[in-house]
């Protein structure tokens, strides 16, 4: 079974509280999503391997450590996932970015794919899938399945808020995918929205309804 990491860092909790507030405007909402993504990135990359290298400082030579040739990919689930990309790229500037467009059918609550663009060598990369919300888990499950069909083997899922139902879905379908969430909420309501949640992340990011 995959590992689920729920963050308890004070900065993340503080920013998440402001993010939830219905009075937080789109500009601040976008900034907070990016900042939370950056903070989460440190834990998501904790298991990255390092290799020794020699570096010369202005004073003398020393042995340092760098990431050991790891090729990375950040894949947002459109459209809300776009809000987390810059936060990850600020820490991982060499990562390539792919895009998977999914929307949730309001009647069936199942994901429908409408767009996909991935790096040519995506199967060689460790992939970080980002989406602010993990509700039913349908979109995340579909995106991960799609990536595996393209040869991806090492995949992590990063969400700002998740419902237990979504985590259960992903763990059942993809027990090899570790999940990282900033906040684990109570449940889904009858409309498939996370409670208490933060509303529609895409609408709040981009100022749409």
Curated annotation (Swiss-Prot):
Allosterically activated by GTP. Uracil binds at residues 194, 199-201. Binds 1 Mg(2+) ion per subunit. The magnesium is bound as Mg-PRPP. 5-phospho-alpha-D-ribose 1-diphosphate binds at residues 79, 104, 131-139, 200. Gene3D superfamilies: 3.40.50.2020. GO terms for molecular function: GTP binding; magnesium ion binding; uracil phosphoribosyltransferase activity. Pathway: Pyrimidine metabolism; UMP biosynthesis via salvage pathway; UMP from uracil: step 1/1. Keywords: Allosteric enzyme, Glycosyltransferase, GTP-binding, Magnesium, Nucleotide-binding, Transferase. It comes from the Bacteria. GO terms for biological process: UMP salvage; uracil salvage. It catalyses: UMP + diphosphate = 5-phospho-alpha-D-ribose 1-diphosphate + uracil. HAMAP family: Upp_B. Belongs to the UPRTase family. This is Uracil phosphoribosyltransferase. The lineage of its organism: Bacteria, Bacillati, Bacillota, Tissierellia, Tissierellales.
